[in-house]
Amino acid sequence: MSTINLPLNLTVRVHPVVLFQIVDAYERRNADSERVIGTLLGSVDKGVVEVTNCFCVPHKEHADQVEAELGYASDLYDLNRRVNPSENIVGWWATGQEVTNHSSVIHEYYARECNNPIHLTLDTSLSAARMGIKAYVCVSLGVPGGKTGCMFTPINVEISSYEPEVVGLQLCSKTIGVQQNASRPRTVSPMLDLAQITEASDKLLTLLGEVLNYVEDVLAEKQQPDNSVGRALLDLIHSVPNMTSDQFAQMFNSNVKDLLMVVTLSQLIKTQLQLNEKLTSLTSFIN
């Protein structure tokens, strides 16, 4: 009889910063390295593994063994714990689209560092025209009194983002197609607050138009109604504060005035710092 001692209903949620760090480590790898590995950091709660950070572990793979700088990995983890004490080791990652023969050896080390570690693979070679991401757990198999082994079994993996990460991703998306279009800027900067409000308002108007079109199509029996969408719209309506147009205009104008005041003060501080820098340089030159 075979034995399986690990639940397979886990869900792995990976944050974009983890993917960026893996790609950066792959780009900085040694010329003789075929793949890069590292440690995954995060938390586990009710069957959900939240991967929020990671770091690279230098290693070399030979035909019959794996050499990894475990002392470096331990020191780096201890340093990270001082900054982020809530992040624990939850598994390890590797570049490539497949689980190799050395994966079980590396997994044994992480099994000593945490319970039920996960294994994350990222296809940095873009073999399928996209950066495929997969997650695995190692399932123990064996016969009582006989030989034992393990098998990497795929589990569900999702991309999850905090609100600041979404803002960063939106900025990164503006550089898509730079190589094909030389007229597009190679770098982007965060927009001013007023420009962000304008862009958000335009997006909100577009989304409201889509919602109105959906409601009108349902009322005209051009589209089948969806109960989940109806409940979401009802919750949205209930979340809107009950106020008159004059009250809303007064509140909006007050917030805009506060925003303009903050922008003005920040520009004054920036100008003062630039002036102070020039005066300091001039004083040093005179002396």
Swiss-Prot record:
Subunit (UniProt): Component of the eukaryotic translation initiation factor 3 (eIF-3) complex.
Q: List cellular component terms (GO).
A: eukaryotic 43S preinitiation complex; eukaryotic 48S preinitiation complex; eukaryotic translation initiation factor 3 complex, eIF3m
* Lineage of origin: Eukaryota, Metazoa, Ecdysozoa, Arthropoda, Hexapoda
Give UniProt keywords alphabetically: Cytoplasm, Initiation factor, Protein biosynthesis
Q: What GO annotations for molecular function exist for this entry?
A: metallopeptidase activity; translation initiation factor activity; translation initiation factor binding
Write out the similarity annotation: Belongs to the eIF-3 subunit F family.
What organism is the protein native to? Aedes aegypti (Yellowfever mosquito)
User: Is the keyword Nuclease assigned to this protein?
Assistant: no
What is the official name of this protein in its record? Eukaryotic translation initiation factor 3 subunit F
- Which HAMAP family does the record match to this protein? eIF3f (MF_03005)
The domain of life for this entry's organism is Eukaryota
Q: What biological function has been recorded for the protein in this entry?
A: Component of the eukaryotic translation initiation factor 3 (eIF-3) complex, which is involved in protein synthesis of a specialized repertoire of mRNAs and, together with other initiation factors, stimulates binding of mRNA and methionyl-tRNAi to the 40S ribosome. The eIF-3 complex specifically targets and initiates translation of a subset of mRNAs involved in cell proliferation.
State the Gene Ontology BP annotations: formation of cytoplasmic translation initiation complex
